[in-house]
Amino acid sequence: MWFPQIIAGMAAGGAASAMTPGKVLFTNALGLGCSRSRGLFLEMFGTAVLCFTVLMTAVEKRETNFMAALPIGISLFMAHMALTGYTGTGVNPARSLGAAVAARYFPHYHWIYWISPLLGAFLAWSVWQLLQILDYTTYVNAEKAAGQKKED
């Protein structure tokens, strides 16, 4: 799955570069005052929030799964709002690579945009697994039942 996504990211970067006049301005770069370690952790937590949202809304079996795109889109939007000024918001290595290839600009810290999403996905998966082990659905269902009793 990685290879086609990387090819698509480079194709999208090339297409965006071809459609916009002048220099490519959509590459990921650390903002002024943002160190590599801060960038690493910001990207990691942004990716973790996105991945955790996907796990809780699309992977978990519920009646509301048909609406999973809404919270996923909102979490991606919030990640961009929070991180763009600091890191350019990579969140996806293929997107970061595509923009870097189109701009022919690979900063010495480009590795952040590859390592952070992997760490963030692992963090989100770990929290999700912990919730599975703790059987959080028991508490959610008990709270739903208590809420329905109040209404009756």
Swiss-Prot record:
Q: Which residues lie on this side of the membrane: Cytoplasmic?
A: 1-5, 60-65, 132-152
Q: What is the protein name stated in its UniProt record?
A: Putative uncharacterized protein SCY_3531
Q: How does it sit in the membrane?
A: Multi-pass membrane protein
* PANTHER family, per database record: AQUAPORIN TRANSPORTER, MIP17260P
Q: Which terms are listed as keywords in the entry?
A: Membrane, Transmembrane, Transmembrane helix
Give the family, as the similarity comment puts it.
Belongs to the MIP/aquaporin (TC 1.A.8) family.
Q: What are the protein's GO molecular function terms?
A: water channel activity
Residues that span the membrane, as ranges: 6-26, 39-59, 66-86, 111-131
Q: Name one GO cellular component term.
A: plasma membrane
The leader peptide range reads: none
Q: Which organism is it from?
A: Saccharomyces cerevisiae (strain YJM789) (Baker's yeast)
| Extracellular-side positions | 27-38, 87-110
Give the motif span (NPA): 92-94
Annotated compartments: Membrane
Coiled-coil region: none
